[in-house]
Structure formats: C-alpha cells, structure tokens
Amino acid sequence: MTGPGPEINKEEHPSSPGKKQITYNSIPKNANLIDGSTNSSKRPIEKYDKRIADPTKSYFPHSISRTPRRKYTYILVLTSLNGTFESKHVVIPFKPDGLKLGRPVANSNSSSSSSLRGGKRVDSHTFSQVRSDNGNFDSRVLSRNHALLSCDPLTGKVYIRDLKSSNGTFINGQRIGSNDVEIKVGDVIDLGTDIDTKIEHRKISATVEELFVQPLLESPIFENEDSDDCHTITEKEEAAAITSHIYGDSNNLELEEVILGSDTEILSGIFINNCIGTSPTLSNIIKTLAMEIPFSKCDNFKLQSMENFLINYTTHLEYTNKLLVEKNDQQLVKLQNGLRRKLSGKYEKIIEQNRNQVKQLERDHMFFKKSFEVKKRRNNEKQKSMEREIEDLKTRLEVERYKNSQMMKKNKQKEQELSTASKKKTTEHDTRGVPGMNPKGTDKFSIKNTLCNHFTLLTFGTISIGIIAIVFKILSPN
C-alpha cells in the first residue's frame, strides 16, 4: 500500500544552475500507511521518522533540522502503594529524550517559607516542584537523578532504566541496571528502599495503573469562538485522531513537513532565481497544490488497496467457506467415530455383564430345581411312612377300643353277678339269724376288691387311648 518515492529531477534549472528542481508527485517510500484491519490495543507507530531516515535532507540544502511534530503522546498513570505520593499522570517523551524520576533539587537562593503537610514540615519550594504531572517525589531515599522513563517511537513500548542511584530501582521486586527494561500495566515500580518509618525516609512504591495514548489534535479556530474553547479536545476529535492515524489520513504533519520543508523553501527554488514575484496568494496556491497532489495520490493508493482487499476477500470467501465446511465435516466424522467407539465399547461391556448374570441365574435355577426335587422326594417318602404308621396306629386303636368294650361288658356282668350274690346273702342272713356273725362285713370287702380291679382296668384303657391319640396327632400331616 506504499507509493513510490519522490522523483528527483537532476536536470538543472536553465536560469539557476546552482538549484535542483524537485517535483512532488508521490509520497515517500518509507511513509508506511497502516491498514485498518489491525486490532492492536495500542495505536500503531508510523515507521516513517525524520530522525531516522529523511530523504529530503540531501535535497533541501536550506532545510532546518527540527523535531517532527507528532499527533499523539503516551500518558503513564502511577498509583502509590504505600501512600507516599498522590497519583501521577506523566507524559513519556520519545527517545532519545526521557523523563527523569527522582528527588527535586532544592533552591538555596530563594527564601522559601515552610508549611506542614502530612504531619511533617515541607519547604514550599520543594512542594511546588512535586506535582502530579512530573517525575519528582518527596522522599530522601531517592537520588536527584534516580531513574529515567522513555518511549520507543517505532514500537510504542515504554522503558525504564536506573541512573546509577544509591538505593536502586526495582521492577516487580527485581533490581534493574542501566539497561532499558520494558514496563507494562500492572507492574510494580519501587524507587529506593525503606530506611525509617517516617514518610520522608520511605521508598516510593507505585504500580502502573494505566498506559494510554493521548491524541494531540487541536480544534479548528473560528472567528466567533473564544480561544479557550478552540483548544479543547472533544471526544469526536479524539476518535477522529485515532481513525486518522489507523487509516493513514491525509492530515499527516510529518508528510506536510517533508513536502514543504520550511515555509519558503519550494518558492525560493522555483521563483527566486527566475526573478518572478512571489505574491502571498500565489504562494498559498502553490503550497496548497504541492500538499494536495501527494495526499490525493495517497488516498488513491489507499482506495486501490482497499479495492484489492475486497476483491481478494470476495474471491477467497467461497474457497474459505468450502475449507471450513470440509474441516467441520472431518471434525464431525472424527467426533462421530470416537463417540461410536466409546458407546460400542460401553454397550458391549453392559451386554457381557447381562449375559453373565443370565447364565448365573440359570445355574442357580437348575440348582434350586434339583434341590427342590430332592426335598420333594424325601418329603413324599416321609409322608408315606407316616401314613403307614397312622394306619397301624388306627388299627391298634380299634383293637384297644374293642378290648376296652369287652372289658366293660365283663365288668358289668360281674357287677350284676355280685349284686345278685349280695342280695342272696342278705336274704340268707336274715333267715338264718345266726348270732355273733356279721355277714355284711365280708360282703363289703369282696365288693371293694372287685371295684378296685375294674377301676384299674378302666384307667389302663384310658391311658392307652390317650397315648394312641397323641401319637396320631403328632404323626398326622398338617
């Protein structure tokens, strides 16, 4: 996206043999135009720097060496970690310049008054030198030239280095030397070491809270506006400055200096040796044309690059989409295969476990079935034996009942015989009337013996019947 360099016509002017004719029909080669597709958090630094390579120095013998005007500056915000200072917003100069950090130099000639601040007496001159926008700190453990902050104009990185201080400079607890060390947001910077608990003898401990770019775009001055309002930078102007820097807008002060040099450089080369009058209007027109021509070509180059980018984007969009679809399909196939393998292995394990469980259940079923058949056969045999015993006991019971009934009949017959015999004896006794004889006594004795015999037989029969009934009840099935 860079255009060709300035074309130098080395043919001498006919009326001025000592001058060289310069035609500004393009921008310099090393004026890098930044593409708008960058996503860097910091604003990119233009690679063109007059202090590094300025092709116009060899062609403008009357040019004045001066520091190029920049459209931005870096702001560093430091916040105290031990309450030794208030938050500072300092501007970081570009190399080879730098911002010194240290203790302010006391002015012995001025009769300054003293005041109390934070419980200690502070000289008013020293206090005036310690501000929130400079690198001075009110601490006696710091050297006057303690450390140096600087910014690289090419990379935009902020560096710090120690200036051979007595108590040292520390970054995140590591002491640094005289070489540049990059600092970033969140780093802890310690200047010096604690000597005493007093505030003036404590080290400066700070953290890099923020590091941002501040655009230096001024508002346009109108006739009906105040000067204070003209120097205020609105949010729209800051956004315009950032956009201008990212997309390489034509309002580039460095290109303007390259094109025009000093105010009268081009005009002196064109008109002075030709003895042509240089009116202010003609001078302004020529300067405007000299500025607008390369800026217009720069815009054309940017438009061409954007057109090429859009053509390439639309050309490769379909191919990129196809590649993405193929990649997604391959990834999907891989995921499906992996999932299938994982699930198949899992299901195979589950099926194998179920098969083993079924086989175990079948074995248990056969075992229980066989044991049940054995128990059933044994129970049947026991039942048959018990039935035979019951039948045997039943026959015995019938026999005993029959015997008992026969004995009862015999007992009744004997009782009847005894009763009849006793009646006969009583009648005989009454008829005989034998004195001194008591026949009733002998009859009573014989009757008692007969009753005892009958009772013994009855008891024996009852006990036999009870024993047979108990055995029958025990051996009978449920």
Curated annotation (Swiss-Prot):
Extracellular topological intervals: 476-478
Domain FHA positions: 116-176
Keyword Coiled coil: yes
InterPro entries with a match to the protein in the record: Cent_Immune-Sig_Mod, FHA_dom, SMAD_FHA_dom_sf
Pfam annotation, one family: FHA
UniProt keyword terms in alphabetical order: Cell cycle, Coiled coil, Membrane, Transmembrane, Transmembrane helix
SMART domains reported in the protein's UniProt record: FHA
Membrane topology (Cytoplasmic): 1-454
Chain intervals for the UniProt region annotation (Disordered): 1-45, 101-129, 405-443
GO biological process terms on file: cellular response to pheromone; re-entry into mitotic cell cycle after pheromone arrest; regulation of cell cycle
Annotated function: Participates in the control of the reentry into the cell cycle following pheromone treatment.
PANTHER family: CENTROSOMAL PROTEIN OF 170 KDA, LD47843P
Protein name in UniProt: Factor arrest protein 10
Protein species of origin: Saccharomyces cerevisiae (strain ATCC 204508 / S288c)
